[in-house]
UniProtKB/Swiss-Prot annotation:
PANTHER family in alphabetical order: ADENINE DEAMINASE, N-ACETYLGLUCOSAMINE-6-PHOSPHATE DEACETYLASE
Origin species: Bradyrhizobium sp. (strain ORS 278)
Cofactors (names): Mn(2+)
Tagged with keyword Hydrolase: yes
Gene (UniProt): ade1
EC number(s) on file: 3.5.4.2
Designated name of the protein: Adenine deaminase 1
Length: 624
């Protein structure tokens, strides 16, 4: 049998194709078949043993590694030889938990951004696009790879589809859907972060059966069930979380919380915000085995990646905190690959794996000179050298803001009871984790309850993007939004259901901003003093844009510049990363997962006004 015939293309991972690929790699490793390319490097890091070897050679066949060893000792024929004697080779970096949607780039352009920064494979935590178009989720994530993009994307369908039983539209996943996803592709690694903790522990929660159905379907396929344990810091809850089979947490905030979760078997995915303190503490604690720790960028935007880097930046932060560079590299490579059960394909410079290599000019500073992916060079410095597939995303990806009417100022009015000069109002703040809302007495004018600038109280709204009717829920929020008259900000990124949110000093400005978003199929819209001052286009899913990161960043910088001309209300909260100025993080203030209690969602059957306690299902009027 001539195995050289009909060797499958190796873009996707398929069991039948994998056998043929491996058969060819065996003969190539033995020197019985010619290899495509050999890369000779000054030294090479074996992440399995955390040891360096000098003057090594990596031999590629197709997109895979066929052989690794001392330079000059490979016995077979090589079509092309490349010499990099001054550089150190480490495996391509992996994102253990990332929402590519938060880069606001489509996958093909995400690849062009992150590959030069070492990121060659990503476990896509897919509950953003899946909440917009759940039926097309895997198709969306695989399309760029099928067209030749070097970035390997391993999707995890979202457990939070919908995030709670009180949210609707765009997608719905249960056990049957997850079982189908796990069967569809070996590149589906499991279930995206389980966030609705009340639905895990409480059998009376309306999402209990749906969520456990998805967990069970993932177990049945030996997939990984990712966790989200924000706010769970007491030992009973941590033990219960681990007992549920939720394998990880990327929400740790303190060293003690990290230790308690690590020692109960959770895989820890560290974000940069708490990394210096946590890593320094773990080093002082004498942690010997770092194999249960990885680094994650989670929701990093394209603008921040251009400024800081991708997961390479996280590793530099860890190294600056005292972690050995070799351990930091393991946290980007073999550790996430083991956790996601992907070691046959990624995570190390070893035969059978994809030919993903990061070439470092300075290991201690993690300075990246080149990146190779799929056995070929794809970047030099931060310049991407590869081709970007030109994808004309179809209507199912680009026509997702379904509002078939003009939104009007009166949609945001909160009518007062007849004859009243004041009304009581329920008020919350961004990242309001308190078990109760605030109550304020607000003035009535022209039959409607009014904002109160003197108390930093403005109006916040959610506009349904799915039904076609543009249903609106609205209430008063404190410590956010514009003081500038006739000013509003609206955005179609509203984690995790991704309806449209708007905050404004007037109802008319809010309507104008929302209508601008509908016209461009999502993104940002800023109305300042009655005029549309800036927009940013997220035309794919209302979450992403199909263009270069630099072009998107230029539009974002223009938005920020216009935003600096607005007087924004601000009050600090106990939630980290809520800053004065342009309130970009309101995108995340609409979350409904633990530890949130009282939230505003789009109008639903259980909460016609949209104001509901997601821990208990209790509702309350927004004014009375």
């Amino acid at each position: 049998m001539d195995l050289a015939q009909d060797i499958a293309d190796d873009l996707m991972i398929d069991a039948a194709q994998e056998v043929r690929i491996r058969q060819d790699l065996v003969l190539t490793a033995l020197g019985h078949r010619p290899a495509d390319r050999a890369l000779r490097v000054g030294r090479l890091l074996d992440v399995h043993s955390r040891t360096w070897s000098e003057d090594q050679e990596i031999v590629f066949k197709g997109r895979r590694i066929a052989w690794v060893g001392p330079a000059g000792s490979y016995r077979g024929e090589v079509r092309e030889r490349v010499q990099r004697p001054d550089l150190a080779a480490v495996p391509g970096f992996g994102e253990v938990h990332k929402h590519i949607e938060s880069s606001h780039l489509t996958p093909e352009w995400e690849a062009a951004l992150v590959l030069p920064r070492g990121n060659t494979w990503t476990c896509e935590a897919s509950h953003e696009f899946s909440n917009v178009n759940g039926a097309r989720n895997l198709e969306f994530w695989f399309e760029a790879r099928r067209r030749g993009s070097p970035l390997k994307i391993f999707p995890q369908p979202g457990s939070a589809v919908p995030p709670t039983a009180y949210e609707w539209g765009g997608g719905w996943y249960g056990g049957a859907e997850q079982a189908s996803f796990m069967r569809e592709s070996l590149m589906v690694t499991g279930l995206d972060e389980v966030m609705d903790w009340p639905a895990v522990w409480n059998p009376d929660n309306p999402s209990y059966e749906r969520l456990w159905g998805m967990i069970g379907a993932t177990f049945a396929a030996r997939g990984v069930v990712e966790g989200h344990a924000s706010g769970l810091r007491e030992l009973p809850e941590i033990n219960a979380f681990a007992a549920a089979g939720l394998a990880s947490d990327h929400e740790v905030q303190t060293p003690e919380e990290t230790w308690d979760k690590l020692t109960r078997g959770l895989f820890i995915e560290l974000r940069i915000y708490a990394m210096p303190e946590i890593i320094g503490w773990l080093l002082k604690k004498g942690l010997q085995d770092w194999s249960q720790i990885a680094f994650t960028t989670d929701d990093r935007s394209a603008s921040h990646t251009l400024a800081l880097g991708a997961s390479d930046h996280n590793a530099r932060v860890a190294i600056e905190a005292g972690l050995a560079p070799e351990i930091a590299i393991q946290c980007l490579t073999i550790n996430p690959a083991r956790h996601m059960r992907l070691t046959p394909f990624v995570g190390s410079l070893a035969p059978g794996r994809f030919g993903d290599v990061v070439l470092l000019s300075d290991v201690g500073k993690l300075e990246i000179a080149e990146v190779w992916a799929d056995g070929a060079q794809v970047s030099e410095g931060t310049r991407y050298l590869g081709d970007v597939p030109r994808i004309a995303w179809p209507d199912w990806a680009t026509q997702t803001i379904n509002i078939k009417r003009e939104i009007k100022a009166e949609d945001f009015a909160l009518p007062a009871a007849p004859g009243r000069t004041t009304m009581q109002a329920a008020v919350i703040r961004p990242f309001h984790w308190h078990p109760e809302f605030y109550t304020f007495e607000l003035a009535v004018r022209d039959g409607a309850v009014q904002r109160d600038e003197s108390q930093a109280i403005t109006k916040f709204a959610i506009v349904d993007r799915f039904s076609g009717d543009g249903l609106v829920s609205k209430m008063f929020w404190k410590g956010c939004g514009p003081r500038t008259p006739e000013t509003a900000l609206a955005c179609s990124v509203a984690h995790d259901k991704h309806n449209i949110w708007a905050v404004g000093s007037s109802d008319a400005a809010m309507a104008k901003a929302v209508n601008a978003l509908v016209a461009q199929q999502g993104g940002w819209a800023l109305v300042r003093e009655g005029e549309l001052a800036a927009t940013v286009r997220f035309e794919v899913g209302g979450l992403m844009s199909c263009r270069r990161a630099e072009a998107l960043d230029a539009e974002m910088q223009a938005l920020y510049a216009e935003g600096r001309k607005v007087d924004w209300m601000y009050e600090p909260t106990f939630r980290p990363r809520w800053y004065p100025g342009f309130p970009e993080r309101l995108m995340f203030a609409t979350l409904t997962c633990a530890p949130w209690s009282w939230v505003l969602v789009a109008p639903c059957e259980q909460a016609p006004q949209g104001f509901i306690n997601v821990q208990t299902g209790k509702t309350h009027p927004v004014v009375w």
